[in-house]
Amino acid sequence: MSAVAENTTTEMPAPILFTDSAAAKVAELIAEEGNPDLKLRVFVQGGGCSGFQYGFTFDEITNEDDTTMTKNGVSLLIDAMSYQYLVGAEIDYKEDLQGAQFVIKNPNAASTCGCGSSFSVEDH
């Protein structure tokens, strides 16, 4: 009797969705800076009216505890502490009547403030 192994591996969805729109805007900003080594770092820190707030910055260095995602040639970095608050989130870039901005849709946020830049999580 012989057995044939089949590859039943399915691709898991990314734990964080980095949209095409966000990747395109980041690529544009990196091109303006003239430094192709830049990556977008997304982080969560204490503050804001709801307890936590999102932050965005460019970084050339990938730290040991960073999770790295790449979309359309653009790298996104998230540190381990921030990652736990961002699992399942969507990072997008929107342009509308209120202006242009990066937007995070976060299913882990129990509540958000009116401006959308800070959030709270439920106690476990």
Swiss-Prot record:
A GO biological process of this protein is: iron-sulfur cluster assembly
PROSITE patterns named among the record's database cross-references: HESB
Q: How does it assemble?
A: Homodimer.
Enumerate the Pfam families for this protein. Fe-S_biosyn (PF01521)
Q: List the PANTHER family.
A: IRON-SULFUR CLUSTER ASSEMBLY 2 HOMOLOG, MITOCHONDRIAL
Q: What is this protein called?
A: Putative iron-sulfur cluster insertion protein ErpA
Gene that codes for this?
erpA
Q: Which GO terms describe its molecular function?
A: 2 iron, 2 sulfur cluster binding; 4 iron, 4 sulfur cluster binding; iron ion binding
Task: Please provide the record's keywords in A-Z order.
Answer: Iron, Iron-sulfur, Metal-binding
Cofactor dependency: iron-sulfur cluster
Q: Where does iron-sulfur cluster bind?
A: C49, C113, C115
NCBIfam families annotated for this entry? Answer: iron-sulfur cluster assembly accessory protein, PRK13623.1
Q: Which family does it belong to?
A: Belongs to the HesB/IscA family.
Keyword Iron among UniProt keywords: yes
Q: How is the cofactor bound?
A: Binds 1 iron-sulfur cluster per subunit.
Top-rank taxon, per record: Bacteria
Summarizing the function annotation, the protein's role is:
Required for insertion of 4Fe-4S clusters.
